[in-house]
Amino acid sequence: MSLFGTTSGFGTSGTSMFGSATTDNHNPMKDIEVTSSPDDSIGCLSFSPPTLPGNFLIAGSWANDVRCWEVQDSGQTIPKAQQMHTGPVLDVCWSDDGSKVFTASCDKTAKMWDLSSNQAIQIAQHDAPVKTIHWIKAPNYSCVMTGSWDKTLKFWDTRSSNPMMVLQLPERCYCADVIYPMAVVATAERGLIVYQLENQPSEFRRIESPLKHQHRCVAIFKDKQNKPTGFALGSIEGRVAIHYINPPNPAKDNFTFKCHRSNGTNTSAPQDIYAVNGIAFHPVHGTLATVGSDGRFSFWDKDARTKLKTSEQLDQPISACCFNHNGNIFAYASSYDWSKGHEFYNPQKKNYIFLRNAAEELKPRNKK
C-alpha cells in the first residue's frame, strides 16, 4: 500500500523534466514548474524527511489549503492530496518519520494530517492566528511546538487537547526554527529568544536583536559536528544577521550582510530595499539560500562571507523556499507576499512553485 493509500490528487501531473522547462518573465531561471500550484499566495514550503523514500513537497497557502506533491527523480511532480483550514495556512512541518504533516493557520488552530489515511484532526488551539509550527523529537518526549500572535509558545502532545506546556512570549511570534536540542523564536518589536529542548523546553537566553527592523524569517545552522550552533535572521530591511550562540569571538564571528536590494547606491539613484522572506540552509554544505520581495533568490557561503549566486528577477516576490533532505532540490514559491499592501494584490496573477537542481551551485567556494 502506498504512503497515501488510494487518495487521488488535485490536478493533472506535470510532464517537464529537469532542464527542459520553458521560460518567460515568471520563470527566468528556466526551473521546473510544480503542477497544480495553489490559487492564492504561498506562505510556506517543506520537503519530506529522509526517513521517507522519495521526495514529497508540502505547501500551505492563503487559499486556506495545504497541498502535497510527489517529486520524482525526473523532476515531474504528481499532486497527491490536499487538506483545508478555515483560514490562511501560515506554516507547515513534517513528523520525523514522515507519516504526518502539521499545519498552522490564521483560523487559530493547528492540525495533524495523517497522510496514509488522508485524515486531518485539530491538535492545537490559540487565541490568535498560529504563525509557526515545528515537530520536536527528543529522546524522552515528542511534541508539536506552536507559536502564535497571542504571544504564547505552546507544546502539544498530539494525543491530548491540552498543551503540555505554555511559555509566554514578550510579543507576537513572527518566525521560529527548531533543530533539536535548540529552538529560536523571533517576535514583534525585535524580540529574540533561544530555547533549550533537552528534558523539557525552557528559555535559554534572550538576545538583543542584531537587526534594526522587523524580523521576518529565521533558520538555525549546524557546526561541522552536526550540532546546532547558531542562526540566520532576516528582516524587512533587506538584511540578514549571522549569529552564533557561543562564539569564541562575538565581535568577529557575528555579522550582518545586505541582500535583496536594488543596485542604486546614492541620492541620484536611490536604493530599493526589500524584505527577506525566507532563509534555508543546505543540509550538506551548510551554505544558505535567501529569497526576497524583490523576486530573486540568492545563495551564500556564510563561512567565506561571499555570495555564490543571485537569480534573475521574477515578475513577483519569492515568498518561501526550502531544500529537500539531501540538498539536491531547491524549491521556491513565486507569489504576492503582501509587502505593498492589498492595493497591489492582483487576484489574476498566477502563483508558482519552482524546483531547481542546485546541488552544484550551493557548494562552498574553494579556500585559496
Curated annotation (Swiss-Prot):
- Chain positions with Phosphothreonine modification: 229
Q: Which UniProt keywords apply?
A: Cell cycle, Cell division, Cytoplasm, Cytoskeleton, Host-virus interaction, Mitosis, Nucleus, Phosphoprotein, Repeat, Transport, WD repeat
Q: Which family does it belong to?
A: Belongs to the WD repeat rae1 family.
UniProt region (Disordered), positions on chain: 15-34
Protein name (record): mRNA export factor RAE1
State where it is primarily located: cytoplasm
Which cellular components does GO assign to this protein? cytoplasm; fibrillar center; mitotic spindle pole; nuclear envelope; nuclear pore; nucleoplasm; nucleus
Gene designation: RAE1
Q: What function does this protein fulfil?
A: Acts as a mRNA export factor involved in nucleocytoplasmic transport. Plays a role in mitotic bipolar spindle formation. May function in attaching cytoplasmic mRNPs to the cytoskeleton both directly or indirectly.
Under SMART domains, the record lists: WD40 (SM00320)
The protein's matches in InterPro entries, at most eight in alphabetical order, are given as:
G-protein_beta_WD-40_rep, WD40/YVTN_repeat-like_dom_sf, WD40_repeat_CS, WD40_repeat_dom_sf, WD40_rpt
Span of the secretion signal? none
One Gene Ontology term of the biological-process aspect is: transcription-dependent tethering of RNA polymerase II gene DNA at nuclear periphery
Location within or outside the cell: Cytoplasm; Nucleus; Cytoplasm, Cytoskeleton, Spindle pole; Nucleus envelope
